Amino acid sequence: MAFSLCWKAPRSPWSFLQAVNNGSPLFLWRTVGSCLDPKMKAYLEENTEVTSSGSLTPEIQLRLLTPRCKFWWERADLWPYSDPYWAIYWPGGQALSRYLLDNPAVVRGKSVLDLGSGCGATAIAAKMSGASKILANDIDPIAGMAITLNCKLNGLNPFPVLTKNILNTQQGKFDLIVLGDMFYDEDLADSLHLWLQNYFWTHGTRVLIGDPGRPQFSGHSIRHQLYQLVEYTLPEPTQQENNGLTTSAVWDFHP
């Protein structure tokens, strides 16, 4: 079975937000290459492809797994690290990134937290659009490395990447939180909803959510607190990679 078919949908409901395993270290990248293991960097470069096609944001180059990569076709268990969700440009993230690029005033001069950052595309879009401070968050240390590489691809100085579960910690104030494709499991959706509500009530922070209309999102109670800002038709390659999902939208959170 092709590797991509095994992990297109996360198997674990906590895959983005819980530690990869109990022994995983937590890293915070602050400068280009400061924590990039040379062997890991070489492995990622060998087994991903730099691409800007087939997405809503041709302005952004990313290292992704594509059909031209070996592990797109290999069995999932042959990939030697945690499941590489960061190596797919998910449709909710595409919509968020497109929206920020088209509406730079949303982030210009503001501090932004990209929750479940994955490949880092939305954080990169925020930086391109003039955000003054960015923190990308993903629990997978390899995602942190990939984000740093993707910053370099786009001519950006890297922003901090925090690789830990922040749902059980207190964070400083950000002007904007963005998250895409995080409502794929009911339990995770409940936890995110509670965390976002508490953060909003504490800090008054604006929250933007990108999602292609997965059932776990469309049927969740958070929908009663959301206002749709925009909906995009997904490019054909993204539709094919996501089981026929045809659109993706950006929502403004108003609890």
Swiss-Prot record:
Pfam family, one: PrmA
Keywords, comma-separated and alphabetical: Cytoplasm, Methyltransferase, Mitochondrion, Transferase, Transit peptide
InterPro entries in the cross-refs: Ribosomal_L11_MeTrfase_PrmA, SAM-dependent_MTases_sf
Superkingdom to which the source organism belongs: Eukaryota
Entry's localization field: Cytoplasm; Mitochondrion matrix
GO BP: negative regulation of fatty acid beta-oxidation using acyl-CoA dehydrogenase; peptidyl-lysine trimethylation
Enzyme type, top EC level: transferase
Gene Ontology annotations for the cellular component aspect, listed alphabetically: mitochondrial matrix; protein-containing complex
Keyword Transferase on entry: yes
Feature: transit peptide: 1-32
Reaction catalyzed: L-lysyl-[protein] + 3 S-adenosyl-L-methionine = N(6),N(6),N(6)-trimethyl-L-lysyl-[protein] + 3 S-adenosyl-L-homocysteine + 3 H(+)
Main location: cytoplasm
GO molecular function: heat shock protein binding; protein-lysine N-methyltransferase activity
Signal peptide bounds: none
Residue ranges of the TM segments: none
E.C. number(s) listed in UniProt: 2.1.1.-
Quaternary assembly: Interacts with HSPD1; this protein may possibly be a methylation substrate.
Record function comment: Protein-lysine methyltransferase that selectively trimethylates the flavoprotein ETFB in mitochondria. Thereby, may negatively regulate the function of ETFB in electron transfer from Acyl-CoA dehydrogenases.
Family indicated by similarity: Belongs to the methyltransferase superfamily. ETFBKMT family.
Protein name: Electron transfer flavoprotein beta subunit lysine methyltransferase
Origin species: Mus musculus
Gene behind this protein: Etfbkmt
